[in-house]
Amino acid sequence: MARVLEYLKNTQFGIPYGVNCLNVDAMGFELAIQYDCAFLQLDSVVGHVKPRDEPTLDAFFRLYRSRCQAFVMGGVRFKYQPVLSEHTVEEDLQIATTRCDGVCVTQDKTGQETSLEKIITFRRTLGDFPLFVCAGVTPENIASQLQYADGAVVGSYFKQGHKDSGDLCPEYVQQLMDAVQLARNSH
């Protein structure tokens, strides 16, 4: 991963790039700092640790946010993350706004469509705070999702068989981007 980030930094394509180290948040922050990433995605910023550990997690985010200039995208009730919070989802979303620059929403697993109901709940709670759909985005659902979300992170849809282990398929990228353009033009 470091080799790719070093290449992107040194080549200076003029396009934003970022990093996601899944559940290794410190490594994500360190790579984002070292390679001048424009953004950093974290699987969870609240609710995934025991309540007694929330103050430590908050201190972790305050420390790294003071050192890192990247736009931090943080998951709340994110796929594969335990929900150990004693708070409502609405309360955790409010906490998230102090730990990241944009909230990521997913359903339960990679490639599974994120329900419009969950996206709407997050949007209503977050108001104008940036919201990104980060699982299950397809050409068929992107228009309805972008009515509520500010953007999307797409992985498995772009790959052969729409599986996260597949190779990148340019045709799938084009299909989704055509649907995004159509959705943008209709608003």
Where would I find each of the regions flagged by the language model?
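Short secondary-structure boundary segments
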Residues: 44, 76, 107-108, 135-137, ...
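Short beta-strand/loop segments at the ligand-binding rim of alpha/beta enzyme cores
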Residues: 10-21, 67-81, 121-135
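C-terminal appended segment following the main domain
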Residues: 152-187
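Active-site-adjacent beta->alpha loops and helix N-cap segments on the catalytic face
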Residues: 1-10, 23-30, 46-68, 107-126, ...
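Conserved anion-binding
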Residues: 24-104
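Catalytic cores of alpha/beta
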Residues: 24-37, 87-94, 124-125, 131-155
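A structural motif corresponding to the C-terminal end of an alpha-helix
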Residues: 8-16, 64-70, 99, 178-187
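Structured helix-beta-strand junction loops
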Residues: 99, 106, 128-129, 148
